[in-house]
Amino acid sequence: MSQMNVEQFASELGVLPTVLLEQLQAAGVRKHMTEDSLTEKDKTQLLEYLRKIHGAKEEKGRISLPRRQTSEIKKADSTGKPRSIQVEVRKKRVFVKGVDLPVERKTAEIPAPAAPSVPPVRTPVIDAAQQALRQEEARRQAELIARQAAELREKRLRERPPVVEIKEPEEPAPPFVPAAPVAGPEAVPVAPETPSAAPGETVAAVEAEAAPSQPASTEGTLHKPAVKPEEKADKKKKPAKQVVWKEEKVEKRGLKTRGDLSGAKGGWRARKDKHGRTEEPAPHAFSAPTEPVVHEVLVPETISVGALAQKMSIKAAEVIKALMKMGNMVTINQMLDQETAMIVVEELGHVAKYAALDSPESFLADTEIAPSELKMEARAPVVTVMGHVDHGKTSLLDYIRRTRVASGEAGGITQHIGAYHVETERGMVTFLDTPGHEAFTAMRARGAKVTDLVILVVAADDGVMPQTVEAIHHAKAGKVPIVVAMTKIDKPEANPERIRQELVTQEVVPEDWGGETMFVEVSAKTGQGIDDLLESVLLQAEVLELKAPKDAPAKGIVIESRLDKGRGPVATMLVQSGTLKRGDILLAGAAYGRVRAMLDESGKQVEQAGPSIPVEIQGLSEVPVAGESVVALTDERKAREIALFRQGKFRDVKLAKQQAAKLENVFEQRGEVKVLSLIIKADVQGSYEALTHALQQLSTDEVKVNIIHSGVGAITESDINLALASKAVVIGFNSRADAVARKLINSAGVDVRYYSIIYEAVDEIKAALSGMMAPERKENITGLLEIREVFRISKVGAVAGCLVQEGFVRRGSLVRVIRNGQVIHTGELDSLKRFKDDVKEVRAGFECGLSLKNFNDIQVGDQLETYEIQVIARTL
């Protein structure tokens, strides 16, 4: 290898040449110029110096064994749910080569021989070359042992060496020559001019101290001398080398008993190690608690019995036992509601706390933009048209659409869309058609103010009807202003003043009379007052100052939804704020999906929709519920997570309420309470509400009326299928079944009853419930007989000759045998004869012969009492 100078070596190390010169001089290398050459010995000397000043140690003859141990623990999070945590324990053990053992020996005390004294040896059998080679090897081994002894002594002064179990070598270790041997500062020098016999004696002396059982090596022989028997015995006493992990040592002591406070010793004397020190127990040793442990249990909205037991660190059987004492029959996987779970926790002596709702829906609140940060713009009013049937509501809407929608779009309007918008000279108006008011009721129940105005349609020739009053109640409950449209004003029998008077009784006062409600007279046939109606709506909207942000994520509500055979789930959505674009990710209740197609009320494709614009969207995962709120998100994965969470939450809450088998429902579960299931369809909402209320009043402790479904309209195929599944009776009040439903009724044999008078329906249902009730049984005594004679006949048995004292006796009558005033038998007559003829009946004052079925213990003087059971039907 070519030598390099100081400057080249400094550039290779990345340091300044002047700094390298200072380090070389401090290490004892005499170099003064950057052009001076460096040898391998100089580099090694510099390396040893740097190791010494930095505290580095040579790692010779060491083996490091890393060890990893993975385990899994379960810990409850902030919501109370158990979470699995992976725990990894890393350990490292270092083993030193056995030649490093004699650390207590002081190499400096090894006496140097004054004169070579060669012990007597056998006659050499090898040549001189081999003998010289063997002596050279022994000399190298002596130098190595001396050097290692010095290094170990130096290390012992620096730090305490680790304690390891090492087997002492039985024979000298093979020669180990380092790559660049450097003598330590305290190493014993070995003179090169020592006579050839001295190295052998030095090796023998060192080995005699380190391992006395090993005899001195004999020079000039090819075989090892025999070991003496006593030396073999000494070797057997020494244990073999073992690699032992401290963490795996098992303490074989007495079992720790409950209540023992002796520091986990269990009353046994601790074992001592080879140095006389008492071994301490493992820090993770289990000690049984001496008093009950009270846990703080976080209870979520719903939790299973097994999970609740795990939180309290008890068995699930204990929780089930506590619930059974409270009257709940549950299983280990059954869901409990929060209130029940907290009562159980308190009953078992733990502390129950409401768990923080770990709901993905919190993501919606975090991502919601504050209204103050958004730019608010004016939006069109949303108007709902309400009114009684046949009051001209449909005609009014058709006239507005026909005159205010472009002629090219008039034929393309899809009638099933329940919302559309109209352009006027003063702005746009969005109309919301909610037949039956079902969607409006669902929206108001969810607290969503969808409608800004209500147009109340009242026929001028008919007056205020029940559904009109119902519409007024809906509007007042939602705190929505009303504009009254009096239709059919062109008819001769129209009477607007009567309409005003009737509406005043419902607290709807016109402006002419000092109120706040605008009244407009319109005619859907001639078009009279249509412009005034739209003008009134827009004027009322200006007073309300309707505003909504446009440049924001879309929010809205589901108006209608259905399942289309060709397009899948389809929902009509009203955008309330923001802008809905094609491709946005929507979340509607438990449904989610990407907007794949968006249509307006004309059936045309649109790319975006602003506030107060109704659109029909496709691409949701399922059919959403009418009245559900819709929000646009940016992350489809988060939308799916929230939707699945809502589905699971709804299912868990439903199961927790349904599965709880209370003790008070035991009789009903055993079938002792009979249930009559009904499906009611009526022409108007008021009719089925009144009929439902009247029928539910018929329920008693023995029979119960269960209204499975009630609605407005004709009896459909779905109603018949529901009746088949639930074994219910279908009642049509001023309503008939359609053609498809009639075919299913005839084929399946479903009981369908039609009524037009509410009292007829109530009377028939009452009669049906009376037939389901258990009848009343009444006992009537028919006759009294006295036994005058008893005849014993071998084939027949005992036959009694009797006299009828009162009433009459019939064949097959029920009879009691009375002896000394006590009833000894209750049974039935087997035969009845007068003289030798069988008779059906014997009246008072006549004698007869009779025998009892399965009873022969009759005596003279006994009395027979005949009776019959009368069944009386019960009524409500």
Swiss-Prot record:
Residues 387-394 are annotated as: G1. This is Translation initiation factor IF-2. The keyword GTP-binding applies. One of the essential components for the initiation of protein synthesis. Protects formylmethionyl-tRNA from spontaneous hydrolysis and promotes its binding to the 30S ribosomal subunits. Also involved in the hydrolysis of GTP during the formation of the 70S ribosomal complex. Pfam families: EF-G_D2, GTP_EFTU, GTP_EFTU_D2, IF-2, IF2_assoc, IF2_N. It is found in: Cytoplasm. Residues 433-436 are annotated as: G3. Residues 164-288 are annotated as: Disordered. Residues 378-547 form the tr-type G domain. The gene is infB. GO terms for molecular function: GTP binding; GTPase activity; guanosine tetraphosphate binding; translation initiation factor activity. Belongs to the TRAFAC class translation factor GTPase superfamily. Classic translation factor GTPase family. IF-2 subfamily. Residues 244-259 have a biased composition (Basic and acidic residues). Residues 487-490 are annotated as: G4. Residues 523-525 are annotated as: G5. Keywords: Cytoplasm, GTP-binding, Initiation factor, Nucleotide-binding, Protein biosynthesis. Residues 179-219 have a biased composition (Low complexity). InterPro entries: DNA-bd_dom_put_sf, EF-G-like_DII, EFTu-like_2, IF2_assoc_dom_bac, IF2_II, IF2_N, P-loop_NTPase, Small_GTP-bd. It comes from the Bacteria. GTP binds at residues 387-394, 433-437, 487-490. One of its GO terms (cellular component) is cytosol. Residues 412-416 are annotated as: G2.
